[in-house]
Curated annotation (Swiss-Prot):
It catalyses: heme b + 2 H(+) = protoporphyrin IX + Fe(2+). PANTHER family: FERROCHELATASE, FERROCHELATASE, MITOCHONDRIAL. Pathway: Porphyrin-containing compound metabolism; protoheme biosynthesis; protoheme from protoporphyrin-IX: step 1/1. Its main location: cytoplasm. The keyword Glycoprotein does not apply. Catalyzes the ferrous insertion into protoporphyrin IX. This is Ferrochelatase. The keyword Transferase does not apply.
């Protein structure tokens, strides 16, 4: 049988339809910031749709999918959808979901930084779950002429359930492309000096505006990272070690000791053992032990979201106060702070080396 007799669509059905390639097309470079995701609206239906996608990821829930899907569809989604929607509604901003709003601000803030330093790059963002999806944004970048893409996860510490699954989604999208762009990935930046500096600046600026804890009197700074099941540590995931590394570097930058600063893990899901100590019980214990003031900062979250605004700002605060604590402070995440935007630019620039991203700058721009 000749290939001439086979319908064209049958030969290319594995791959997305693409326009003809032209040698004269723009050869552009893109930086794609990737975050976890968020529901499109604070409604039970939207939240259930988001949770179904998120909790169906085998890198997030590592149990047999046939068993898990029955539990997820019959128990978890019906129960958690409405309860989670109420929590999202409590933190929803006029512009939309906090995570999406702050991520968009990061993109818009880093664009002029690149331009001012002579970089001609496209900057955009995508979400691993929900919209805009990684596949859709990669397709948009291709249509804009991007032939090289830097994937920059907004997860400073590597984990299979965050960084790796974002890369999975990107590579799956690439697998459907006939004409693939060149791709680089940033695995982690848990110990990057610019990231640590941005964290320290965020804490210092908060204390400058709201007062520094009286560490000599027993006040505490708690560094709360997102938790993961403990078995992932036993299976070789480096997340726990990188969280501890970030915490140690941040404490050093702030001049604090392990007596003044605690490291905890939040957002436990299910009954399995997760990384410990858990954040809410630790804050309750601190309050019961007579700690007057506790400041909580989340170094692993680069943008404020449900887990920081609601879980830390309401649930963990209540645990501390009910335990006997008097003064609770939630230090905002990096969001679009100048130090963090500068760090993003620096991390991206290091990973763009060798790609044609620089343009000639006018003498007055250089001086």
């Amino acid at each position: 049988m000749s290939f001439d007799s086979v319908p064209r669509h049958a030969l290319s059905m594995r791959f997305d339809l693409e326009p003809p390639s032209h040698a004269s097309a723009a050869h552009r470079v893109a930086v794609l910031l990737v975050n976890l995701g968020t529901p499109d609206a604070p409604t039970p239906r939207a939240v259930r749709r988001y949770l179904a996608q998120f909790l169906s990821d085998p890198r997030v829930v590592e149990i047999p999918q046939l068993v898990w899907q029955v539990i997820l569809r019959t128990l978890i989604l019906p129960l958690r959808g409405r309860a989670s929607a109420k929590k999202y509604a409590a933190v929803w901003l006029p512009e939309g979901s906090p995570l999406r709003v702050y991520t968009e601000r990061q993109v818009e803030s880093v664009k002029p930084l690149f331009a001012a330093n002579g970089y001609r790059v496209i900057v955009d963002y995508a979400m691993r779950y929900g919209t805009p999806s990684i596949a859709d944004v990669l397709a948009q970048l291709k249509r804009a002429g991007a032939e090289r893409v830097l994937l920059l996860p907004m997860y400073p510490q590597y984990s299979s359930s965050t960084t790796a699954t974002a890369f999975d989604a990107a590579f799956a999208a690439l697998g459907r492309m006939r004409n693939q762009p060149e791709v680089r990935t940033v695995r982690h930046y848990a110990d990057h000096p610019a990231y640590i500096h941005a964290l320290a600046e965020q804490v210092r600026q908060y204390w400058a505006a709201h007062g520094r804890p009286a560490f000599d009197a027993g006040d505490k700074l708690v560094l709360s990272f997102h938790g993961v099941p403990k078995r992932t540590l036993d299976l070789g995931d480096p997340y726990h070690d990188q969280c501890q590394q970030t915490a140690a570097l941040l404490m050093s930058a702030l001049g604090l000791t392990t007596f003044e600063c605690r490291v905890t893990f939040q957002s436990r899901f299910g009954k399995a053992e997760w990384l410990q100590p858990y954040t809410a019980p630790t804050l309750k214990e601190l309050g019961a032990a007579g700690v007057r003031r506790a400041d909580v900062f989340c170094p692993g979250f680069t943008a404020d979201c449900l887990e920081t605004i609601e879980e830390i700002g309401i649930e963990v605060r209540d645990a501390f106060v009910h335990g006997g604590g008097k003064e609770f402070h939630r230090i905002p995440c990096l969001n679009a702070s100048p130090a963090w935007i500068a760090a993003l630019g620096e991390i991206a620039a290091e990973n763009l080396q060798g790609w044609p991203v620089r343009v000639a700058m006018a003498p007055e721009a250089v001086s």
